[in-house]
Amino acid sequence: MVKKSENPKEWYNEIVRKANIIDDAYPVKGMPVYKPYGYKAFKFLMSLLENKLESIGAEPAWFPIVIPYSIFKKESEHIKGFEEEVFWIERAGNDKLEDPLILRPTSETEMYYMFAKWIESYRDLPLIIYMTNTVYRYETKSTKALIRGREVLWNETHSVHRSEEDAREHMAKAKEVYDYIFWDVLYLPYIWVRRPEWDKFPGGEETYAADAIMPDGRFLQVGTIHLLGQKFAIPFEIKFLDYHPFYKKYGDPNIYIKDKNGNEYKVHAPKEFWEELEKGKLTKTYTIKIGDKEYTISSIEEINEKLKEYDFRKYVWQTSYGISMRAFGGALYWLGDDLGLVMPYKIAPIQIVIIPILGKDDTKVIEYSKKVYELIKDKYRVYLDSDDTKTPGYKYYYYDLIGVPLRIDIGLKEVENNSITIVRRDNKKKYTISLNELEKIDQIFKEMEEDLKQKAKSFVNDMVVRVKTFDELKEAIEQNKIAKAPFCMRESCANQIKELLHAEVRGTDINPENAEKERCVYCGEPAKYWVYIGKTY
């Protein structure tokens, strides 16, 4: 097998096949078969994610795999972003379909068609739905197992809210969930970026992406969170009856109201009025101005009485976010070494393998190994490999290859000392503990976790370099580094960088770092923000 230290790309291509993660002998490009070991690990990952999503109010649902084109095309920006990637179903049996179907590339349109039917009033909000499924995109670039494919296993979540503020609060919760997955489960070296305008989700207002940095210095997008605003709510007519008729627009500081004929007016009121209104209770009398009319309002009930001529129905605010098999593949790529995979222990199908070292008294060793297995099998996913046709050396090689996090060696010495020898997969560190100290296994897992997190943190710090000139940028990219550079935020400059260096402007920090005192790394014009630039998958 190719060594990761010598050729990480080729190592990855080999290891996901040799370690029983996937088999791509299936004759459709970009659609591999997930073997039981690999699929179990992915399911454990999705289970952890689903539990976290439910902790922030999300509920599971299932939507059809096909979407009528008439529904899919309702949001114009969305269709422009995906139309070239979709798989079409134009016939059913011998009949040509009048309304062609597509295999879902993502589920916004099919979900929102139904959300419009489910939501009536503010009491129905928030609505938060997740679905672990497969999506299909006709990927024309070269495919790469788990990283770039045509059938994508993933989890997507969609949320619907009363206001922009509520939507943004939910995005912050979604980010916490994803940070748990990327950091506490997968130990990935990653950064959050806000995508530039030209690279945000089709049909969205803002896109925040988690970009992991792979061993070869390339970015791998492992998750995204989108503020959709009202861009889907309007074409899909997702409205709700609110307890007041005032509303905001994305990117506009003003507050508006509409009469029942659709005429729109700006509303002027004290800041305190808006603050109390959002809490659902007014504690004093306020004067508000709508167009050339003034109203005195002292309660929510008075809003309903005095503002009957206005429309209390509003468009919802929405978010969507997703994690795919890419995060799983990225973790395998990042954590592995020359010996094989290093499986993150929270998703490892086998967390601990017990290997009896047979010799003078095989019966004692086997019986003791079974005893150890019984003591720990209810707490961990444990496999006792008592196959006497294979040597311990072969077993060490195999379980290193598939990345089992901990190995327990049991020979006659361990039997006599009432102990076990534990070997960590990531760094080969050995521990000898008494059978009365099995709680120390938790400590070993925790120590392993902290070491892997520190490794990821150090890697990000080493990989990201600040540059100010194009020559410095070029040098950083040639050295497979990630550059942080001042940038004018023009798409034309980003395109030139991509053409010349085969690197992409990924975006700013979530809270953009101001670069107004600097010059754009490409064109030399005044810069706006510091951005991350690097090669990508």
UniProtKB/Swiss-Prot annotation:
Top-level division of the source organism's lineage: Archaea
EC category name: ligase
Annotated Gene Ontology cellular component terms: aminoacyl-tRNA synthetase multienzyme complex; cytoplasm
SMART domains recorded: ProRS-C_1 (SM00946)
Molecular-function GO terms, alphabetical: ATP binding; proline-tRNA ligase activity
Coiled coil segments of this chain: none
Keywords: Aminoacyl-tRNA synthetase, ATP-binding, Cytoplasm, Ligase, Nucleotide-binding, Protein biosynthesis
GO term, biological process aspect, one: prolyl-tRNA aminoacylation
Pfam family, one: HGTP_anticodon
EC annotation from Swiss-Prot or TrEMBL: 6.1.1.15
Function: Catalyzes the attachment of proline to tRNA(Pro) in a two-step reaction: proline is first activated by ATP to form Pro-AMP and then transferred to the acceptor end of tRNA(Pro).
Subunit structure: Homodimer.
HAMAP family named among the record's database cross-references: Pro_tRNA_synth_type3
UniProt record similarity statement: Belongs to the class-II aminoacyl-tRNA synthetase family. ProS type 3 subfamily.
Free-text domain note: Consists of three domains: the N-terminal catalytic domain, the anticodon-binding domain and the C-terminal extension.
Name of this protein: Proline--tRNA ligase
Originating gene: proS
